[in-house]
Amino acid sequence: MSSLAQQLQSIASLDAARLTSAYGAPSGKSYLFPPDVASSHDIDSIFDLAQSGFDELLSLDPEMEEFEEELFSESAKRTDRMVLSKEENDNLDRTLGRCLRRLGKWIRLMAGGKCIEWMVRRFRVHEMNVDEVLRSFLPYHESPNFPRILAIVTIPKTSPYYATFAPLVKDAQPIPRSYIVTSISPAKDKSLVLLGDIASMVQQAVKEGVVHHALLTFWTATMVDLLEGARHGKGANEGVVKQLVESFVTLLETPKAGEDVNAAVYPPLVLLTRTVPLADEPFLAIVSSLLTPGTGSNPSQRMLTLLVILNDRHTWSLGLGEHATENLAKVSQLGEILVAAMDKYRFEKALNIVVKSMLEKPDLHAKALATVLEHESLPTSVTELASTNLLQLGSSTDSQEVKAACKSLLTNLRERHPSIVDTAFLQASASLEIDTHPVDHGLVQKPSGEVAFLDVYAADISSRVTGVKSVIDMAKKGEEIESSITALEARLSDVDENVVNALYEEPKSLLEILPVEKYIAGVKPVFWAVSPISHIIGLHLDFISQHLLVSHPEAGKQIYESLLFPIFLSTEKRQPLTKSQALKLLNGGFKKLDKLSTIGPEIGKAREEGMKGAQKGNLVIAKALAGATLSSSTFEDDISFLIAQLDSTTSSARLLAYLILHSLVLTLRGPRQLSTSLSILKYLSPRLTGHSLRDLKHADENVNTEYMESVYKKPEETRTTLRAIVSILAAMGKVIKPIGQIVWLSGESKAKDASYKTFAQQIYLWANIAILPANVAHFLLRSLLTQLGEEALLFFSSIWTSSTSPVPLRISALKHALAFIHAYATLPTSPAAQGQPVDFQVVLPQILIALQDSDKDVRRVAVDVLRSVEGGEGMGDVYALDTIYGDRSEMTQLLKSVDRKKYIETLLEVAEEFVIDRLRLKAFHTEVLNMQSGKNRKESAHRRAIIGFLMSHVASYRAIDPRLVLLSLLSDVHDTSILRSAIPLLASLFDDKSEESLWLSSLPDGQQALYVQALMGSLRVQSVSVLGEAGGEGWEFLLNLLDASKSSRFIARLRILSFKAMVGGVFSALEAHQQIEYIIALIQCIHALPTDDALDAVKVLEKLDIQPRVLIELIEHLSDPLETSVNRKRQRQDAADEDRPTQAVHELITFVDSRNWPSIPASAPLVASLMSILSALLAKRLIVKEGIDYLEQEVFGAILALVERITDAQEIQRAHVGIEVVIKVIRASTNPRTAQRALLVASELARLIPDAVLHNVMPIFTFMGASDFQRDDAYTFGVVEKTVSRIVPVMTQSLKEKAQNSLELYTKSLTFLSIFTDMAGRLPRHRTLPFFVHLVKSLGASDYLAPVCMLLVDRATTKAGRNKESVSTALELPANLVAAFDVSVKTQVLGEIVQELARLIGDLSKADKEAFLSQTISENDATDRPLRQVTYLLSFLSSILGQLRGKACSQALVQSAVRQLIVLAASTSQPVMATTDIPSNLHKTLASTMLLLSADNFLGVTAELLSDGSEQDIIMSLGVFAERLPLIKSEVRLRCTKVIAEILKRIGGLLAASGATVNAALEAVKSVIKTAIAQEDGALASVLPTVVGCIGKVKDSAVIVAALSLVELLVRRLAARTIPFIQSILDTSLNLIKSTKLAATATNQAFVTLSSVIETIPTFISSKQLNAILITTIDYRRVEETNSASLFTTLAKKIRTKSLFPVLIEAWKTVQEKGGDNEMKGFFEMLRLTLKNAAREDLPSMLKPVFAFFLDVFDLRHRLQLKGVDTRVVNDVEESAIGSFLELVTKLNEPTFKPLFIRLYDWAVIDLAEGKNADDGRLTERKIVLLHVMMGLLTKFKNLLSPYMGILFPHIQELLPAFASGSVRSEPLWTLLLNVLGKSFEVDSGAFWTDALEIELLPQLVAQVPLFLPIAPSPQSPRPISSCLANLAGSTTAENVLRRLNTAVCLATRSDDPKVRLAALDALSAIWDAQAEEMVGLVPETVSEFLAELLEDESKDVEIAARGVLAKIEKVTGSLKEYLE
């Protein structure tokens, strides 16, 4: 393999979808398109799509340019990630990451989607950059974009996003934010990796400058939700808090992060501080970060956030961090921010912290601190803090700047809060050291400058005067200029004369200080005041006149408009200008003002005394100002100012403006009059809505006395203003119409036309709406119509055809038009006056427009107008013929009188229908004007005359709405004349400078589109003949639309409409030569147009229906440049000629690609024509620069689509279609896609010309093996599959004919099959299986599936074959291949594989190889390759069996396979396989195969092998039989009883032979027993004797155990059927138990076998047999107790007591003879179990001998002691005997037991008492037995046996004194007696003992204390007497008994013998332990009388013991020191 191939293969896992085109095919998954659509786009189309998106993004985001070269260029198109090195891929990953993050902003735009599509399809970012992709899309998680990308991503398990999003990929959908928040929470992601990833998204975006709104919104919301969850849950995890704090601080400190980023941090930051109690260090870090400068944050937002978190932290005292003061100084408008926050939220705590930091450097914060401290609602705490800190700092600092700042702040503060500042001053004075830093009292005193500014605003006049003077003095010195200007500006509006005089005291200084604008702004309120003071105005006028205008004459216009204008008009209540003040306007600087210089005298005259004089003066001034305005050089500005004053709130200014404008309207002439009037109308129109002026009397165009009186007396009333409006509107009637013709019916007009048309329409509107007084309205209308004259009808037409005219106005215009038409005859200038008829047809189109009006009333009046213009048949003078459309009127076509009359009459016939339905007019024209069959030529001429008439008006009428209405009338009329008329209009749009084009360009886009669409609507199928007219413009127009060299703003829209018409049927109606010409022009146009336009053209080309004959001609035309003439002489050609072949290729590509070849009728000549393209391309391959590969591919695709539908082979042959060209293209082309399509064509031609194809079959397969097998795309493998399906069957048929059997067929096909199987490792993984499935189906699965699978398995045996795959991976392919076929084929393969396994295993020991796979082994192969072949075939076989499990398979094949596998399994003992896994694998395979075989067949195979198999085969078959038999269901077993019986019979024979098969035979029988059914018991019984018999023949313990186990199972299974064999079983088992040589396991199993016999058939075991069993078991107990105990239990439970007890009695004799303690214990254990399991009904008859037996047994102690047996042994034996006795007692009731107990008492106490002393040894022994029995009874039965103490009590009273006196000295008896008494006290519960009995017994018991002192007490074994007395004390609560007991024992402590004292103290200690609480009352006497003495005892041991007793008492009572003193 080449090194390049190795490299490609090594990275196949990174890019499994291999790239196939010249630059590689795109990834199969798509972001934008569904899979079926995505597969149709190759890399070039995706690149073009990406380029368009990238270009659009570049215009939006120029920074995208950095990715152009690397990701969006031609070189990027060739970038193949598969062949890049790791370093190159890493660099590319970084670039892609940056690009994806920048694209995050544009994801919702289509342009962004296009770029992402490119990155998915080209760079596979959805697989290789998944994390970056998901990060970019996460902000859009709830939009459709997110599931679109999520559905295609492949998330690696190592990604932090895997756990969250991998489960969602399959069913991708928008996800809620709550899901993401849960995923990043510590409960879901303990590593917090995902949280860190998301938290860092904004930081990364800021770093790269790619922040966008969606990202910030997502980030903030996610962080907030995460913290909200923690807030309402268990709190925030420490790791989460750490990550969030770090993220927030980092973002807040990021330079130039911007306002949006910082705003995004604030909500989660505040929530964090409120949710989590942060430590001081992270909190300080957050606070410090909020003060970081240069971050681009909004200062208000940041400071508010800081204040919020500081205010929430109530105990914060660590300040704002280092450099906080300096950073605060950099906050813009800090003071205003703090004041606003203080007003709204108070924030007192936080404000203290911030102000404290600012006060550290007050010079830096002087302005901000002043703003805060001067606030009226400043908290007291802040005031106190500021006072203290400023005093301390100001007194201690050496810096003059700091001291000045402190002083300024303190003085201002003291003015507002004197008491607080003074208190702080006193406190500071007391705290500071007087000597070093005395408090500076000057800090709290204001400087003189500040006093001055305060005085300026003082209420006192004198203070204001002083302040003004001081401020002016300061300003003169250059101090506080800005503040001075502000203060002086404020005082300019002062109304006190003294203050004003003070201001103007130094006029020059004032001018120098105040800018003119500031002066005018300051003084303006005085002039515009409601009640101005004239003498104050006079002072200001003096200054303006004498100083201001002298220094600043340029301010004259501003002074006139801002100050003087409102004071000109005098009213009754407002007279700002007296005569003396008015005269001031005549002098000084006012003389230089334009307006005042001409009206000075009038102003003076106007100010006469008296009201009438004032009214007249107002009019005089207004006219004078109007005249001044008229002559002004700034006329337009003045008019604008006057119109603006019409809205003034100051009535004087407003009314004066009305008066001036009124005068101007009347005096102006020409354009100025018109423009001024229009401006006034424009202003008034919207403001009069809702007002009515009709009730204003005496209103006209003149300014009358009533009007002026209202102005003077009632200026504020609305009615006065309305009168002024009516007066000025009435004056509009004096406006004179411009000289010359006005084109009323035109959308375009000259300036003068437009102005007057607008004016006339406005006046007409005012005159016709019910607002104006009637006389004014009539006057305006009469004036207007008088000036219009004959043009009135055209004017009316312009009104009703205008869409902007209201309905009432349209109706009025129509009515006026009707009146005009009737009155026209009376006009002197009218032709009717001379007796000539008047033809009004020129307005007929306008009437038609009115007939389509939306309002019914309009249509009704329009009908009346239509009737009025009907006229007669004569052709009179045509009204307005030359003027209606201005210069375009000559284009108007007139109707003949006949046509006119007929047309109007026809209209009038249905006129009422027009009124009812506005659409009826269109339907009428459609009916009348459409061509109708049967109509004569005259009718056609009439119809065309009307169409021509209407279309001429369309061409002349340059107004969009009328044109559209008229065109709509003809939209459904089909006539060629419409198109002829429309073409000139359309053609004129080619020239952008033409009038038509310029006019259309001025319209809105919507209207342009409607108009062009309406014109192009005339291009219909019915008008196609116009396109073919000689000399016509139609065809040229269409071709020009396809001429890319022509540019026009409308050509693209026209082209699209023409395309629509062509597709709509026009193209199909063209002649063939026209179709060819159009298609060629269209193709050339596609290559010359921009991309988007070209795409539209391509879509049109695709939709055009082209017939095959035209297609053939087109192909000839388009491919002509590719044809090479042999005889053509070589000559120099220019560059255009050289590029012509390339251009032809592109044109052919466009054409071929546009056709839907599957829908084109199949034609062999057409195929031949396409083949000719391929032939021509072969000759031009070296010349053509680009596109040849794609063209070949498309041509092949076209050929394929046609050939697939051709069924007649003769047709192909007649057309001379061959395969040679196809083969040549395959050899010549380097593009795999071309060759693939060629293969498809070749495959399809194989059906029609098979001989030619088969002749070239080897080149086909050579190509496939060399290229296509290694490519990964669906198309390539579709080609391969089709090729295989067509050609492979032919070859396999030949092979089948030559082979005799399957092995021979496999061998002959080996070379052929190896071609494919050798390529398996180089095929793309996901394509491999589908290919081989298709291959096998083509070969024939029944014949070839097995050998193909064998060869695929054989690949795994060599490294080269595996091709770097693992063995398991290599074996997956054959397994998956088999899985694709049905069960029958799989079963057949199973048999073949088993046979091949047999052959391979056989070949291991043969020289001549037989197996199929042995043929693949060469001399150079490793020696273990055959073993690997076997191993891997077994593995493959297992996978087949897994697929067949549970399926119905052919039993014959499976049975054969099973038999073969069993034989193979038996033969795996060869040395060569000993060290391999082959044997175990073979067994597993056999087990799996058995699952496929029916039980009947399996048993049959077993029976056959048992009869004719070798020893190894028999062992193996028995093993399989044992393993599989339990799996057979009972109903199946019932059916197979005979077979199983036969098998058991043969197994019996094997057991009798005792050979190597014994163990396997035993396991087989065991398997039968465990699952046997009743019908098999007979056969099993026949095997039992042979099994028992074989036990004695074998020596191996394991086999013996197995046989015994089998006997046990047989006995339990067969029950009574085993009776004949009981003796042999018992003998065998007992002999094994007695044997000393056997292993323990064999002995154990022998006991189990015995138990099974006893449990199963107990009644059939004889006494002799039982005795043997008992004796043997008792003897064996010496060796091991467990088995014996188990057998004892079994005997006691299963054998009846009546039968067993005599045997026990008999056995007792044998046991006594042996005399061993172990045997005795075993016997008594057996006796105990017998009595325990005895039936109560059996006991009465046995009781006497049983009790006698026990009495004899109880005397055993004596007999044993005589033999010298150890006492411990005697006690153990006795305990065993007593235990047996107790079991007997358990079975008895009291009446039966009591006599027995009395008899036992007599036996122990009385029988031997006569004649013997009390200490006789035998008597003592019997008493000990009695007490042992009693102890056992008390222990077992508790208080139930307490009454029986009464029987013993007399003898106890005898024994205790006897022990005390020393007459009885048996310590065991004494000990047992006291223990019995203690146990009796313990369990009594009042059953026997009473206080009297206890008191009676007490002295005797206390007398036992000094006895047997050598017995040392211990916690584990206390002295018997101490325990007895403690139990006595614990059994009673009687004070009398306890006191006596305590006293008696205490008295014993006074014994002279220290040992006795110790014994007494031990007893006393035990007593107090048992009953301390009840004996508390005895403490004084016990402690003070006895223990006090004992604590001083001479014996140290006694003292220690006494202290121990005292300590126990003190645990209950506390300290007892008082009793010891």
Swiss-Prot record:
Cellular compartments annotated: Nucleus, Nucleolus
Function, as annotated? Involved in nucleolar processing of pre-18S ribosomal RNA. Involved in ribosome biosynthesis.
Q: Which InterPro entries match?
A: ARM-like (IPR011989), ARM-type_fold (IPR016024), BP28_C_dom (IPR012954), HEAT_Utp10/HEAT1 (IPR056473), U3snoRNP10_N (IPR022125), UTP10 (IPR040191)
UniProt-listed Pfam families: BP28CT, HEAT_HEATR1, U3snoRNP10
Question: What are the GO cellular component annotations?
Answer: 90S preribosome; small-subunit processome; t-UTP complex
Provide the assembly information.
Component of the ribosomal small subunit (SSU) processome.
Q: What is this protein identified as?
A: U3 small nucleolar RNA-associated protein 10
Query: What family classification does the UniProt entry report for this protein?
Result: Belongs to the HEATR1/UTP10 family.
The principal location of this protein is nucleus
User: Spans of the HEAT repeats?
Assistant: 837-875, 976-1014, 1281-1319, 1935-1973, 1977-2015
Any one GO MF annotation of this record = snoRNA binding
